[in-house]
Regions:
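Conserved phosphate-binding/catalytic region of the ribokinase-like
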Residues: 1-6, 11-26, 45-155
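Non-cysteine beta-strand/loop elements that form the S-adenosyl-L-methionine
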Residues: 26-35
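Short, histidine-centered active-site or binding-site loop motifs used for metal coordination
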Residues: 34-36, 89-90
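A short, structure-level motif marking secondary-structure boundaries and short turns
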Residues: 37-38, 113
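Short active-site loop/helix that positions an aromatic residue
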Residues: 40-42
Length: 155
């Protein structure tokens, strides 16, 4: 049994409507984008926060993050019944592929080490925004670049 289970379940052209995040139960963290969540919940009109709570309850997830494109990301902790909003940092968007994967990786690592969801959400959003600027993985973010990025944006 793993201590922390994070799930990122994506819709793409090959599996639209054929996959579901609902087969994963009791995850520590679910990362899903707004349209994937609405598809999963079969609800295009309800407020995001209501759908996030419903999804968390159904999956018995401790934490849910919904990425919302240029609206940023919304984190929900079921134990604290608390939402945290992170802004969108990406102003230059060339390629979205991999940004959610990086977001999940950075968030999961920082949150498991620090238990500071706000810092993890913020840093994950910053890193994901950096991946949007280039096609593919031609621009790999170093530790030093990440530190400068976080410090600059905290000011």
């Amino acid at each position: 049994n793993a201590k922390n289970i994070s799930v990122n379940c994506q819709i793409n052209a090959n599996n639209n409507g054929l996959h579901t995040i609902q087969k994963y139960k009791n995850p520590n963290l679910v990362l899903i984008n707004e349209s994937e969540m609405r598809n999963e919940m079969r609800d295009k009109d309800s407020p995001s926060r209501l759908l996030i709570k419903r999804l968390a309850k159904h999956l018995k997830a401790r934490n849910v993050i919904v990425t919302q494109g240029n609206e940023g990301a919304l984190f929900y902790n079921t134990k604290l019944k608390k939402f945290i909003k992170a802004p969108a940092f990406g102003s230059i968007i060339k390629d979205k592929v991999g940004s959610g994967d990086l977001f999940l990786s950075i968030f999961s690592i920082i949150n498991s080490v620090t238990e500071n969801a706000e810092l993890a959400l913020y840093t994950g959003s910053l890193c994901a925004a950096e991946t949007l600027k280039e096609f593919g993985n031609s621009n790999i973010l170093t530790k030093e670049q990440l530190e400068k990025l976080v410090i600059y944006n905290l000011k």
